């Protein structure tokens, strides 16, 4: 170590060493660490936010040079946060994920009064209604800043919502005083996250500003679509294998019933199907004497089974008619052969 380096090391106060050590310990304790902007936050609101984050996140303020030194010494990529250490900032650390941290900080923001000389973050409106202030000079102050105010029913009334300063304009002394008198706090103060580092990834506020419920619904919808695609494409995965097996079993059973494949698993269904077909066929025969005794006075099965049975019966009837027609043709052919033989015998007798 050179004399200059040794002299520089000796000049570092002990309290700074201790401060950096505590900051490094904080950085190494939590999963997610961010840099937040605290500019313009009154001490009261800052303390309220610190209490609101208690148990969920830790907020630590220090000199920027010490924050940078701690981020560099902690390593593991945390030094990427040093670019955000500028102005009035602090470190916030949590075991929550970056999206959860962002939501915590947004929810911790509170309304605050605005001072003269500040830029209006949005349109500043004096709302319609009773101000609760007795008649006096204050009505003139309201009118001076552009509020439609009158004395009515023994008090100062604002007759309609009045924009007294538009977004982006500088707040005047008169507007600041009137707002303070009315107890209107037009701006929102809170810890603005500049960047957060978690599990080796640096996140910006723009990346974290999402609707968590909507995002969760999108993920669930995508997962359901992927599952359906896997099942319909017969692509087995750990999650879809049970569904594919159940689907295959159902399709195999349906095919077995349609093809009347003999199987112990299909025996009961095949017997039920055959019974329905027999009953449907028996119901189509008008002559009960032509039926076995056990099939006499039977009713046709229910509509679904009956439709299937009727189709089968019609097919069988068509086959029977076709068979009878074939038999008739054969009989005609036999008769023709007999007639031909008889004619030949007659000619033989005629010509000796």
Swiss-Prot record:
Coiled coil: none annotated. Keywords: Ribonucleoprotein, Ribosomal protein, RNA-binding, rRNA-binding. Residues 286-352 are annotated as: Disordered. One of its GO terms (biological process) is cytoplasmic translation. Residues 343-352 have a biased composition (Gly residues). The keyword Acyltransferase does not apply. Residues 286-297, 324-340 have a biased composition (Acidic residues). It comes from the Archaea. One of its GO terms (cellular component) is cytosolic large ribosomal subunit. The keyword rRNA-binding applies. One of its GO terms (molecular function) is large ribosomal subunit rRNA binding. Residues 299-310 have a biased composition (Low complexity). Belongs to the universal ribosomal protein uL10 family. Forms part of the ribosomal stalk, playing a central role in the interaction of the ribosome with GTP-bound translation factors. This is Large ribosomal subunit protein uL10.
